[in-house]
Amino acid sequence: SSSYISPEMRALDTQAKSAGLALVNEVGLDPGIDHLMAHYLVENYRASAACNTANDLSFISYCGGIPKIPNPFRYKFSWSPFGVLKALASPSRSLRNFKEFTGDRPWNALSSYDAPLPAPETFEVYPNRDSLPFMEQYKFDPDWRVKDFVRGSLRLNGWAEAWTDVFREIETLKGPEGDQRMTEMSQEFWTKHAYGPNDPDRVVLCVSLQAERDGAVVWHKTYVMDAWGDENGTAMARLVSVPVSLAVQA
């Protein structure tokens, strides 16, 4: 599965191993390819001469599926709008300047990110879900000084402004009636803002690890992917389904 590991799935781990079964999750794009990049960065840093417990580390991982040709809404849907809206109603947890940062809503934690693409481009980014458990998953040493650590979503510049009315309404939704209204919004967005058969999509993924000491950068590496859809299919479908199929084949 390309989905995050659920508590129910995690609880089956011992039972599956005893039965000789492999339950494989988080092997799509995000989560998936981003995990590979993160592990490579951490191992590269650990093996470098610059690795030192006196360093201050900053880790970011931003991923987003966006229209290749920007539209006024600054977004198009390649999957259920309900999932996107539900994520916007969820809090996030990350590290910012050595302190735990909790965002009640993504738009309240929005920042700007200059992606180091061949043609540099600025995006809007925000933390997604709970980033902190991934420090252990990516094998950050417990004695490393981690200044910033965030896994988040990436959007086109102007996204927050275009979605202002959406944010305002989401803040008012509560209980079963709120879920019903979110379902209605999802249907409306799918009608108005879904990708058409000839609409090219784009996926941008940036994963970076930087080490500083006394304010000077001593080690820095970033992995970047900028993929576009074409006549053979969308970039999102390719980058999610191919890794899953490779995992199944393995």
Tell where the protein language model's regions lie, with residue ranges.
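Glycine- and other small-residue-rich loops at beta-strand/loop junctions that grip anionic moieties
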Residues: S2, E26-D30, D34, F123
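Rossmann-fold NAD(P)-binding glycine/threonine-rich loop
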Residues: S2-L23
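Short gly/pro/ser/thr-enriched loop/turn and capping motifs at secondary-structure boundaries
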Residues: I5-R10, D30-D34, I66-K68
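Short, hinge-like loop/turn segments at secondary-structure boundaries
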Residues: Q15-A19, V42-E43, F77-S78
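General beta-strand structural signal in soluble alpha/beta enzymes
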Residues: L23-N25, S61
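Active-site-proximal alpha-helical scaffold in enzymes
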Residues: H35-A47
